[in-house]
């Protein structure tokens, strides 16, 4: 800590920045030391996976690549064919983002129009007007 306190920063003139302070003083910039400039070290990347850095095990393909028998299946769909046809037909347009966005905008706009058309017009206080007669203040004024 004591060695850090002894280091002082001397003002250095930087071309083009000398008049940047309001009082016209030069900016104080610490000169880079030889220690702070380091070249990047070339080192091999080492990643450890499992025991003895084994990345791919030909003897245990199931744990290396995943359980394809559990998730990948060539069996036909267990759902009703009519149900599958319905979802393939009517959900196909919504697989595209643009069509889904248009559907949501039209649905939201129509909902907003319906709610605003069916709203009661006298909800705002300015439309209702005063509900009670005004009470006079402390000096008898309204």
From Swiss-Prot:
It holds the Pfam family PSI_PsaH. Residues 122-142 are annotated as: Disordered. Keywords: Chloroplast, Membrane, Photosynthesis, Photosystem I, Plastid, Thylakoid, Transit peptide, Transmembrane, Transmembrane helix. The chain crosses the membrane at residues 99-119. It comes from the Eukaryota. GO terms for cellular component: chloroplast thylakoid membrane; photosystem I reaction center. It comes from Zea mays. One of its GO terms (biological process) is photosynthesis. The gene is PSAH. This is Photosystem I reaction center subunit VI, chloroplastic.
